[in-house]
Amino acid sequence: VQTGYTYTMNLNTSFSGDDNLYVRLKSGENGSQWAVKETYHIETKDWSDALSVDKMWYTFPVGDNITAFAGARIENYYMYVTPSIYKPGALKSFKLGGNSNFGASTDVGFGFKYETDGGFAVASNIVDKNSDSNGLMGKTSVSKWDTQVAYTTDRWHVSATLSDAQNWTSQSYNATSLGAGMKGSDGDTTGYALRAYWMPEEVGTAVPEISVGYDTKKADTPAANAAKEADSW
């Protein structure tokens, strides 16, 4: 029998009533047995008993239709129009396919989301894992820039996302075997993601909710004997 624990504290602060400064503190000690689980980021995180800042970003409105994001510890998928019925924690783990274009690592990032009352939306954001030492969007940046176009109603959603990664180092995270093979390249990839979901009019009936997705990702300069392209669904 192996045991462990996790502790999470979510802090939300508003200065105007329309903005929000979000900080997530997290601690835990669970050992290596949790590191390979697909639900690792939902159930626990191994901080060796230290209470640390796990997430931190600021959200504020720009006019009536734009929401802006900026933070020292943020991920791409927090700045999208939600492309799945799954909640954000599960979205990161499942991603509707291995090595999805929605994967990212927590670091410095910023972006915006434009939403109309009719359901149309556009979102674009970038996260840079190397910004602390080399600044944002430079030649040596370890970054992922995603742009999404979406249409959402009360019961269904469709979206398409372009993901451009530079020197990316997380190709193998939660990936299929083929997707993990792309880690041998220089990290530059171009990917496309399609998402859709549908919910029945009445909740709790025998009619299921449906959420589907398809991703394709191609290495810009694949290494020898490394995967050039990976698909997932």
Outline where the language-model segments fall:
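Extracytoplasmic/secreted cell-surface and envelope-processing proteins
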Residues: Q33, Y78-Y80, D132-N134, W168-Q171, ...
